[in-house]
Amino acid sequence: MRRNGDGEEVVAKRRRRIKELVQVALRGGCLAASATAMAVMLTATEEGVADIYGFKLTLSSNWSFSPSYQYVVGACTGTVLYSLFQLCLGVYRLLTGSPITPSRFQAWLCFTSDQLFGYLMMSAGSAGSGVTNLNKTGIRHTPLPDFCKTLSSFCNHVALSLLLVFLSFIFLASSSFFTVLVLSTP
């Protein structure tokens, strides 16, 4: 016959494992989103010809021409490395049966790191969005047109990359939330 305390212990252990599986899944999602964002941004290059007042102007665009896009690639690189490390550590601990966050210190470290990389991704996405908006709308006080009419593939690559950067931020914020749940449990 089972005592009530044993049943509660089994349920608590099962809940902890589900939370840990969700944490590992969030790490995997962040890794996939940030790696894909980086790959899409690195392939953002195109050449075209724009017609400005009857003059043919050759346009060439590459992600490396903009410091904001370079910042996006750098932020994605750091986040990929961090997420890969956390994912490998989480999978290892799941397979060995030990808790993913064995101490409060490590939980605080994960929380701080998730916040740091989350804000890094948000700032990179915001910086890239400003340049993308300028490319899409053109410069209003000069007669320069928007470049996205001529370089639509480049603009689509950049927009998809920035969408994935913001998705990576959501994964990091969710992972940070689960770490707060671990910290709030006595």
UniProtKB/Swiss-Prot annotation:
The keyword S-adenosyl-L-methionine does not apply. It is a multi-pass membrane protein. The keyword Cytoplasm does not apply. One of its GO terms (cellular component) is plasma membrane. Residues 1-23, 92-115, 183-186 are cytoplasmic. Residues 45-70, 133-161 are extracellular. Glycans are attached at residues 62, 135. The chain crosses the membrane at residues 24-44, 71-91, 116-132, 162-182. It is found in: Cell membrane. It comes from the Eukaryota. InterPro entries: CASP/CASPL, CASP_dom. Keywords: Cell membrane, Glycoprotein, Membrane, Transmembrane, Transmembrane helix. Belongs to the Casparian strip membrane proteins (CASP) family. Homodimer and heterodimers. This is CASP-like protein ARALYDRAFT_316979. It comes from Arabidopsis lyrata subsp. lyrata (Lyre-leaved rock-cress). The lineage of its organism: Eukaryota, Viridiplantae, Streptophyta, Embryophyta, Tracheophyta.
